[in-house]
């Protein structure tokens, strides 16, 4: 469990997307090629990707004292699960926990997509192209999995997204403090008429590194209340078979196909 945690308060988010911009700038990520079009959740870009690690989504939420819906806005990134599916299914051990955060070693990643299939939050994605910054450093590596690293690789004391949030919707502190804050906010929201207000991230996958204050039930935000865990017995057997295949005269493409299909089966069974 990470000693510290993010706090996302959906009731305070203004949808300014400063967090998206800060994440792009600090990590040197390229811009998405998008159209001037509001998607189903009025988002742009449409989702998290290998080059977009922070995403702001708009959801309609009903209030008990109003006849019309209002918008609630949610900041989304990797949830940094204490016991992440992505780590458990990775055949190359390219995913690990660093100071409590879930990070990917692109030098070990073979781009099989096992982590993509296993994540119920649809966070990691395989990059479709290489991208270097002005200094010539590889920021994005083609056919490798990428996602939020909680700014651990850049050794920031406060993650970039949190440092620029103007409304206090994003906080970063010791996890117990974030949980206490979240529970108090839920009490306030219920008093304001949000009868279904709740805290998300307390128990899912052993506890998440992102604690979220919701104004409605988790499913309204596409968040599973009881997300499925990977069957570790099957996962270990799959890794054993993968290890045997990797010692044989099989190329990377064949190994990638095996890992991808196996992970889809594990995700389906979960």
Task: Give the ranges of each region predicted by the language model.
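Non-ligating segments of multi-cofactor redox enzymes
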Residues: 1-270
């Amino acid at each position: 469990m990470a000693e510290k945690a993010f706090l996302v308060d959906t009731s305070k988010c203004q949808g300014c997307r400063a967090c998206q911009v800060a994440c792009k700038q600090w990590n040197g990520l390229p811009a998405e090629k998008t159209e001037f079009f509001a998607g189903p959740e009025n988002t742009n870009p449409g989702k998290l990707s290998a080059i977009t690690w922070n995403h702001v989504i708009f959801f309609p939420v009903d209030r008990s004292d109003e006849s019309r819906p209002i918008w609630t806005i949610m900041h989304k990134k990797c949830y940094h699960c204490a016991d992440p599916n992505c780590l458990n299914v990775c055949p190359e051990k390219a995913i690990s926990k660093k100071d409590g955060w879930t990070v990917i070693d692109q030098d070990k990643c073979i781009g099989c997509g096992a982590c993509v299939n296993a994540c119920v939050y649809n966070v990691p994605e395989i990059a479709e192209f290489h991208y270097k910054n002005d200094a010539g450093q590889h920021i994005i590596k083609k056919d490798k999995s990428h996602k939020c690293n909680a700014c651990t690789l850049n050794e920031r004391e406060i993650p970039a997204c949190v440092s620029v949030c103007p409304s206090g919707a994003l906080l970063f502190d010791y996890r117990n403090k974030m949980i206490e804050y979240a529970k108090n906010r839920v009490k306030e929201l219920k008093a304001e008429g949000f009868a279904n207000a709740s805290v998300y991230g307390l128990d899912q996958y052993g506890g998440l590194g992102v604690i979220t204050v919701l104004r409605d039930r988790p499913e309204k935000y596409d968040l599973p209340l009881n997300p499925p865990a990977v069957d570790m017995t099957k996962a270990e057997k799959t890794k054993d078979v993968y290890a045997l295949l990797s010692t044989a005269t099989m190329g990377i493409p064949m190994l990638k196909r095996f890992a991808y299909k196996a992970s889809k089966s594990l995700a389906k069974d979960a």
